[in-house]
Amino acid sequence: MSVTLHTNLGDLKIEVFCESVPKTAENFLALCASNYYDGSPFHRLIPGFMVQTGQPANPSPPENPKGGRSIWGGNFEDEIRPALRHNERGVVSMANKGPGTNGSQFFLVFDKAPHLDGLNTVFGKTIGDESLRTLAKLEAVEVDKKNRPKEKVVIERVTIHANPLAE
């Protein structure tokens, strides 16, 4: 199962680990299918570490808070799996503010990040050479002192490939 995030810097194809983390996969795929991520900015970028996205493009609290929400309306529990680790470039993981605070935001690592193992739910990884090129372009974006990209970088749209949740 995979999705392609079409960004203004190129495509990121992500293999989603549906069987290992079913609730996280369901949330991510449903948000993708509902166009939730269309226009979502890459709002935090730390070269050598990660890039974060997944907040709504047009937040309007309380239904769609700036920090994002899950398909269930609030946060949901972690699905930490010892076999799923932040062990290579392109691993995709849920962003959170502590245990059980997953919503819609996620990040992609630029390198190994073992200090995140056990803290953030890994739910996918980038696949293909084009994804690696796009990650390199993302990592090269200049940032300000608060790790915000100085240029606009967004998810323009998402393509779902063989969605097992489709009815």
Question: What is the role of each PLM region?
Answer:
Residues M1-E167:
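Cyclophilin-like peptidyl-prolyl cis-trans isomerases
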